[in-house]
A protein has these predicted regions:
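Structural marker of alpha-solenoid helical repeat scaffolds
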Residues: 83, 117, 151, 185-189, ...
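Residue-level recognition of tetratricopeptide repeat
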Residues: 62, 96, 130, 164, ...
């Protein structure tokens, strides 16, 4: 699935800023804290001044983001950070832009700086985890996602992120459990995402728990999105369409990456390793790096290669 999800992901936050027509200077900090996941305790500390003063450079940077000029916005955020390297709004803006540009090491360093100063900032922990995940540092990603869920437990995307990294680590039972919680948390907030159900399905299959795998797939079929992706993926897994038909529904590189990944995972579960590897290797070489499935395919390929080298 694409990494963005509502307000819990950097790209979607940038999109929201771009489309937030009533974005005003005096609401900037409180908007950033409420949208980006600062804990209630830290919100109370930072917002104790009834009229928080915003660095004009940061204000201008967010205005530039709203206009879609992320390059100039980044310059303004960095100028603001030369004046105050702990400016939360500037750090968040810089981190979001680095993530959007796939400059993952710099995004990680920025989010790491945020959690060093604001250790209960759930969004920053999740952003730190996403950056580590994209660099395939799964242990660091795991620890970061666990921190995010601890600080903001009613957040489906944080648990979904946790499930993805557990899949990449080969911890399939833990991945299934995190995916199950993700679905519950999405439902609690009136949100929907089919991806935790897909994760749970394959995690249970990898853990050889066919009953729970089938239950996850049945639930996905009953609750699949109408006439929108990834509904064709669910139809494929349920046996209603074949692989070439699934590919026929693809409209962009992210969907193509997902389609090949799920075809590969299904073939893998059926024991057809050669056919599965063709799809997973295609994803690892040609897939869209912006989606979780790209990294999962690479991780599974590595696990299989290491297994072959084991005595």
């Amino acid at each position: 699935m694409p990494l963005p999800d509502d307000v819990t992901n950097t790209q979607m936050v940038i999109t929201k800023i771009k489309n937030f027509n009533s974005f005003r200077r005096l609401t900037l900090i409180l908007y950033a804290m409420s949208v980006l996941g600062l804990s209630a305790q830290e919100t109370a500390i930072i917002s104790s001044d009834p009229l928080p003063q915003q660095n004009p450079l940061v204000t201008k940077a967010y205005e530039l983001l709203e206009l879609g000029d992320s390059a100039e916005a980044l310059i303004h955020f960095q100028q603001a950070l030369t004046e105050n390297d702990k400016d939360l709004s500037a750090l968040l803006g810089q981190a979001m832009i680095f993530a959007d540009l796939e400059r993952h090491a710099e995004a990680y360093a920025t989010y790491d700086s945020i959690v060093a100063n604001y250790p209960r900032h759930a969004f920053a922990w999740n952003g730190r985890g996403l950056a580590a995940f994209n660099m395939e540092d799964f242990d660091t990603a795991l620890n970061s996602f666990k921190q995010a869920t601890a600080e903001q437990p009613i957040n489906g995307f944080f648990y979904e992120s946790l499930a993805w990294v557990q899949m990449c680590r080969g911890a399939f039972s833990e991945a299934a459990e995190a995916a199950k919680i993700a679905t519950l948390m999405y439902n609690k907030r009136g949100e929907n995402s089919a991806y935790p159900l897909l994760i749970a399905y394959f995690a249970y299959l990898e853990a050889e728990d066919k009953n729970n795998a089938q239950a996850s797939l049945n639930y996905a079929v009953r609750n699949k999105p109408l006439n929108t992706w990834p509904s064709p993926v669910i139809d494929y897994l349920a046996g209603n369409i074949v692989g070439c038909e699934l590919i026929g529904y693809v409209q962009d590189s992210t969907q193509e990456t997902e389609a090949h990944t799920y075809i590969g995972l299904k073939l893998r579960a059926q024991g057809d390793e050669n056919a599965a590897n063709k799809h997973l290797e295609w994803v690892a070489r040609n897939g869209d790096r912006r989606v979780f499935e790209y990294t999962l395919a690479r991780a599974l390929n590595l696990q299989d290669s290491l297994a072959l080298l084991s005595p």
